[in-house]
């Protein structure tokens, strides 16, 4: 199974030939097909005898790949998920061929070192202190959940008698925030946005103060969105940070989609306030054009995350 045979070498050449041709050409405008249609053409692809490398590559290149949207095509930029650059795709091949495991320093010191360098760069452009730190996780859903678990863990220490915990966000927040709330068994406080459809500190302060005054529920996190997936809206992060700080509430920024806009001087001002976040996420596989999928999760005080998740 792990021998480099003549057959494997021939397959490697075919893989490289296909990969180079795909990278050199303009991205195709492919699209989905129905399950029934695909099954009629391919039948069962998992068999007792196996298809073999050559046939498997043929199935992929001639059928499966053509039934997928090419998210790196300029006309598909609105699909958001991923548009890796040529360099990213090539180094994805290099990393895969190297059989790396970056889960701990013992097994993958070099990989972890490289990841830490990337995290440090993101910390620098976001304006957080050098003491901040983070980790890469598999997608924004996991990043948001991880940060919100830390947020709740912190506030539990000072408000042990709270009846129900609550996350405050806007109606435009990503569905992963609601998913995180379900997993954590906490409530969601959806707050009205301003005339520009941005969540701001004034509206959030009013909603939270009213909730705290009339119920035994307590908001443990305010989530600001840095680039909503529907309209690309960046919330008023500066005023949200101020509201959170005044009430000793964790401020998390979901920048999975749009926070990479910090790299563009023309729109950098929209993200003012992210430097005051207790945590944020950004997906390099989106506007940083890395391979899918990668979510950078950053904490202002990484030792708090270590306490919660270990």
Regions found by a protein language model. Name each.
Residues 142-308:
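Conserved PLP-enzyme active-site core in the AAT-like
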Residues 122-146, 191-192:
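Short loop-beta-helix segment that forms the pyridoxal 5′-phosphate
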Residues 1, 42, 98-106, 129-135, ...:
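Glycine- and acidic
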Residues 105-109, 113, 137-145, 231-234:
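Short, conserved micro-motifs enriched in small and acidic residues
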Residues 1-131:
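N-terminal entrance/gating region of PLP-dependent enzymes' catalytic architecture
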């Amino acid at each position: 199974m792990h021998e480099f045979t003549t057959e494997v070498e021939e397959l490697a050449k075919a893989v490289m030939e296909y990969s180079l041709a795909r990278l050199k050409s303009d991205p195709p405008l492919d699209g989905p097909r129905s399950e029934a249609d695909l099954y009629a053409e391919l039948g069962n692809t998992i068999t007792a005898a196996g298809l073999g490398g050559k046939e498997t590559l043929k199935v992929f290149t001639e059928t499966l790949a053509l039934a997928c949207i090419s998210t790196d095509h300029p006309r598909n930029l609105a699909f958001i998920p991923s548009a890796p650059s040529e360099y990213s795709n090539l180094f994805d091949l290099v990393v895969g061929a190297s059989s790396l495991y970056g889960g701990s320093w013992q097994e993958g010191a070099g990989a972890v070192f490289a990841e830490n360098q990337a995290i440090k760069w993101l910390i620098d452009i976001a304006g957080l202190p050098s003491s901040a730190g983070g980790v890469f996780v598999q997608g924004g859903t996991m990043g948001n959940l991880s940060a919100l678990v830390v947020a709740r863990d912190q506030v539990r220490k000072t408000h042990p008698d709270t009846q129900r915990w609550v996350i405050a966000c806007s109606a435009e927040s990503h569905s992963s925030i609601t998913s995180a709330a379900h997993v954590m068994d906490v409530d969601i406080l959806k707050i009205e946005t301003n005339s520009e459809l941005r969540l701001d500190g004034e509206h959030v302060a009013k909603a939270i103060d009213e909730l705290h005054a009339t119920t035994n529920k307590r908001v443990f996190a305010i989530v600001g969105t840095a680039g909503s997936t529907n309209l690309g809206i960046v919330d008023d992060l500066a005023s949200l940070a101020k509201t959170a700080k005044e009430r000793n509430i964790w401020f998390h920024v979901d920048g999975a989609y749009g926070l990479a806009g910090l790299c563009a001087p023309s729109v950098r001002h929209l993200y003012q306030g992210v430097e005051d976040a207790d945590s944020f996420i950004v997906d390099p596989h989106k506007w940083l054009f890395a391979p899918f999928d990668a979510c950078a999760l950053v904490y202002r005080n990484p030792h708090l995350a270590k306490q919660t998740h270990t």
